[in-house]
């Protein structure tokens, strides 16, 4: 089953104002203009800045709110970001993305208010018993102008969001990566992070500005749960991951980075997930997703 691609294009909502009688337009055009202007200000002031949604699983009706690109598909209530064969085994050289069609407001330039948000999701990354596997997935926040690259250029360590040309400099994109393979731009194997899987925060580049060890289990029956928080008051972006059956965030893996997101992202942003495989493979499935923001 194939779904329409997700191109990070905001769907504008048109607001229609009833026609104004010509009598008022000719005699009181200035006064009427002021009234209309004040009315529109009231409308804008009362627009709800909070955003929230919850997908405990992904049913076909979710397609009304979600967009897909490249290899990402919805199957049996689960979003598969990268390709599998008929037996469920992961395939090489795959990349896929999905995200919310409706943009999220990160901040209000007029009032200066900035949103705080929490997003939680459950995921499964299965190596199918391979000792060497890759490449990982990421939660992204990006400008609506950002264009998802072709999978042939963004596979492998680029996590489906970068290419060789854009890897070290891309505008208006922030990723939280769940990286299962250490590339040359990742933490040095001699560092305290060791070799292999790690959490990372990427700002306009595939090279992370912050890293932490990703303690994981790539068994096919293991489900991980992640929580990403942004507190606009202290500007901390926090990542928590657990494999606890109770879903409690008990510090299995964590990463905190101080960042003013408004410096790197526009008022309205697109949010979603991306993943890729290269010569090494693993599955990348998102099982549930919720998001709440308030300003």
UniProtKB/Swiss-Prot annotation:
Q: Which residues lie on this side of the membrane: Cytoplasmic?
A: 1-22
Q: Which UniProt keywords apply?
A: Glycoprotein, Lectin, Membrane, Transmembrane, Transmembrane helix
Bilayer topology: Single-pass membrane protein
Leader sequence residues: none
Reported induction: Accumulates in roots during colonization by arbuscular mycorrhizal (AM) fungi (e.g. Glomus intraradices).
Top-level taxon of origin:
Eukaryota
- Residue ranges in the Extracellular topological domain are 46-295
Q: Name one Pfam family in it.
A: Lectin_legB
Transmembrane segment boundaries: 23-45
Gene3D superfamilies named among the record's database cross-references: 2.60.120.200
Q: A single GO CC term, please?
A: membrane
Molecular function terms, GO-annotated = carbohydrate binding
Gene Ontology annotations of biological process type: response to symbiotic fungus
Does the keyword Flavoprotein feature in the UniProt annotation? no
Cellular location(s): Membrane
Q: Which residues are glycosylated?
A: 152
Entry function: May be involved in arbuscular mycorrhizal (AM) symbiosis with AM fungi.
Q: Tell me the protein family, please.
A: Belongs to the leguminous lectin family.
Name of the molecule in the record: Lectin 11
Record organism: Medicago truncatula (Barrel medic)
Q: What is the lineage of its organism?
A: Eukaryota, Viridiplantae, Streptophyta, Embryophyta, Tracheophyta
């Amino acid at each position: 089953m194939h779904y329409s691609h997700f191109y990070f294009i905001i769907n504008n909502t048109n607001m229609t104002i009833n026609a104004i009688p010509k009598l008022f337009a000719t005699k009181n055009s200035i006064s009427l203009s002021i009234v209309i202007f004040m009315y529109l200000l009231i409308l804008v002031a009362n627009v709800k800045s909070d955003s929230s949604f919850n997908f405990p699983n992904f049913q076909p009706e979710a397609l009304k709110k979600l967009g897909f690109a490249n290899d990402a598909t919805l199957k049996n209530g689960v979003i598969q970001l990268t390709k599998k064969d008929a037996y469920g085994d992961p395939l090489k050289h795959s990349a896929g993305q999905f995200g919310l069609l409706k943009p999220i407001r990160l901040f209000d330039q007029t009032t200066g208010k900035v949103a705080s948000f929490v997003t939680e999701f459950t995921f499964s990354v299965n190596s199918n018993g391979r000792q060497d596997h890759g490449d990982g997935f990421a939660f992204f926040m990006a400008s609506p102008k950002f264009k998802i690259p072709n999978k042939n250029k963004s596979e492998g360590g680029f996590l489906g969001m970068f290419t060789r040309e854009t890897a070290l400099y891309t505008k208006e994109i922030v990723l939280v990566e769940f990286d299962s393979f250490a590339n040359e731009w990742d933490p040095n194997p001699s560092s305290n992070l060791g070799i292999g899987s790690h959490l990372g925060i990427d700002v306009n580049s595939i090279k992370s500005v912050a890293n932490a060890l990703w303690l994981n289990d790539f068994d096919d029956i293991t489900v991980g749960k992640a929580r990403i928080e942004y507190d606009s008051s202290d500007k901390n972006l926090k990542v928590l991951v657990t494999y606890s059956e109770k879903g409690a965030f008990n510090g299995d893996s964590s990463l905190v980075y101080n960042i003013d997101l408004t410096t790197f992202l526009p008022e309205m942003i697109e949010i979603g997930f991306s993943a890729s495989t290269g010569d090494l493979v693993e599955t990348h499935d998102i099982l549930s997703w919720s998001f709440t923001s308030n300003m």
